[in-house]
């Protein structure tokens, strides 16, 4: 077991305590730690015995080459790519909206959200696409409820090629 000094000197534990005590809103862990070790630290200090909000990860990917081809800055925020193996429709919507809020805050501009699937607008009838479509509809209603329609645009279910380029997208 780690003693108090060792715990506080471990950045991920210190960050989790900062969130616990309201000194931070989130933890940025980078790629120097495994996701599991970050979530173990967070769960160690989490106070709510029955969590009302699920934990999830946001990955920020910079692809400057994409800005030339697809427009924008080439900055992509990916919601929960490796934490929750089978999120519910409600969780997927929550992850999408919260990730969009963080992206909007960090970029200082309105953002577009693509709820990625193997299907675009029902082109492939499958359960996973149906779940993604339902999550997109719920996310849109959450954005509307929070009066963020002008700040966050949600599209889905949609395949990645269609999400990146409107030239690929025709319904």
Predicted regions and their residues:
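Anion-binding alpha/beta catalytic cores of soluble intermediary-metabolism enzymes, centered on
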Residues: 1-171
């Amino acid at each position: 077991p780690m003693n108090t000094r060792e715990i506080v000197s471990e950045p991920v534990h210190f960050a989790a305590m900062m969130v616990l005590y309201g000194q931070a809103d989130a933890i940025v862990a980078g790629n120097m730690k495994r996701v599991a070790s970050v979530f173990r630290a967070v769960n160690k200090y989490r106070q709510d015995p029955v969590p009302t909000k699920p934990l999830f990860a946001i990955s920020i990917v910079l692809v400057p080459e994409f800005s030339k081809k697809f427009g924008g800055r080439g900055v992509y925020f990916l919601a929960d790519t490796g934490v929750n193996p089978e999120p519910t429709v409600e969780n997927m919507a929550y992850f999408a909206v919260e990730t969009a809020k963080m992206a909007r805050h960090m970029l200082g501009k309105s953002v577009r959200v693509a709820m990625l699937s193997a299907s675009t607008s029902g082109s492939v009838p499958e359960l996973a696409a149906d779940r993604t479509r339902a999550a997109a509809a719920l996310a849109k209603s959450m954005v509307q409820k929070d009066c963020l329609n002008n700040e966050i645009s949600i599209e889905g279910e949609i395949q990645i090629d269609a999400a990146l380029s409107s030239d690929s997208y025709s319904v």
